[in-house]
Amino acid sequence: MNVKKVLLGLFLVGVLGIAVVASGCIGGQQTSTVTSTPTETSLQGKIVFAVGGAPNEIEYWKGVIAEFEKKYPGVTVELKRQATDTEQRRLDLVNALRGKSSDPDVFLMDVAWLGQFIASGWLEPLDDYVQKDNYDLSVFFQSVINLADKQGGKLYALPVYIDAGLLYYRKDLLEKYGYSKPPETWQELVEMAQKIQSGERETNPNFWGFVWQGKQYESLVCDFVEYVYSNGGSLGEFKDGKWVPTLNKPENVEALQFMVDLIHKYKISPPNTYTEMTEEPVRLMFQQGNAAFERNWPYAWGLHNADDSPVKGKVGVAPLPHFPGHKSAATLGGWHIGISKYSDNKALAWEFVKFVESYSVQKGFAMNLGWNPGRVDVYDDPAVVSKSPHLKELRAVFENAVPRPIVPYYPQLSEIIQKYVNSALAGKISPQEALDKAQKEAEELVKQYS
């Protein structure tokens, strides 16, 4: 997922045919209470806003900050530029928050970090601010708010932009081989991919039916989640307020076996799936005309339809397939904004959060950076819809996206899942053994945090 963040600005300079992103730091008294809503002239002070991303994203954030400072002449927002690497961004924030530093005051977080940040007490609850300002939360994706931003009945963050896994397909090849629509089930995908792969290899021996992320890293967990939940499985469940892992459920083992079969039995996915396939190798293979189907994030749409893309105008996008009797599942991704518990100017930080989440700024992210806004109402904006031909379909995917476990030990849990799922893909151990071992280690991990 790191590459995804780096390219997010280029992202949908087509995924919906558009482009995106933001920044802010310190000032008054540390308190969780909310004072009266400041006016444009009364608001004073400085805050630090930490954000990473591609160069064009950082430049856009500078523009957002300039507009905020123009609205509030007595305010200064310092942009603290983070690395493009997602994990490095997390570690930088963790170090600052563990040290109870007021720098940064406000920052973006990958949705997968929320469990750790909330459980560690690093985020300022936003409920009092929302209530005081009568702030309308209904404009956001409610599933995202409830599954990711709220915990224990309290609100800790707001979505800036949304991501979810998608199926890309070659419209021209489906038509060439007699298919009128993309696959709805995984078995349909296998059958279609095999037929297209067989035919295309007569002239292109490097052609593959289906490419996806199988290397040992975070996006492998995202892919695994999609197979698991589209088969009625789950990674875990909450019982009596405690998360209980369910990694070796029969549905999960069946899903992992299918992933293995894509490479070794059906042979529609390349052998290097589990050694090299991350977002960019997957995207490039599809974009160079060497694959019929691709699992990737929304950012790939714009790149597939760039002027120099060999597949420009030939690509369709659809929800990911599912197993019989179940529904499509897409892993929830994206970035959320929150306020540090240790900020010296929480009131100013909250005003900045509201500004970033305002209709005009969110629309700007969509129009200029190609981001998928956290606000639902922006998806109905005529200008955004005009620039985003697939926005309506993507919106439905986002509304039903599945989050990874929102638990404080998610980074360690992810490493466990990555390790054993990848070992199964490589043929080192069976899917059953892989998930049995993952289950045992996950149970031990949970005990450490009990």
Curated annotation (Swiss-Prot):
Places the protein is found: Cell membrane
BP GO annotations: maltodextrin transmembrane transport; maltose transport
InterPro entries referenced in this protein's UniProt entry, alphabetically: SBP
CDD domains referenced in this protein's UniProt entry, alphabetically: PBP2_TMBP (cd14750)
Pfam annotation, one family: SBP_bac_1
UniProt GO MF annotations: maltose binding
Note: The protein assumes different conformations with different physical properties depending whether maltose or trehalose is bound to the protein.
Record-given protein name: Trehalose/maltose-binding protein MalE
Organism encoding this protein: Thermococcus litoralis (strain ATCC 51850 / DSM 5473 / JCM 8560 / NS-C)
Lineage summary: Archaea, Methanobacteriati, Methanobacteriota, Thermococci, Thermococcales
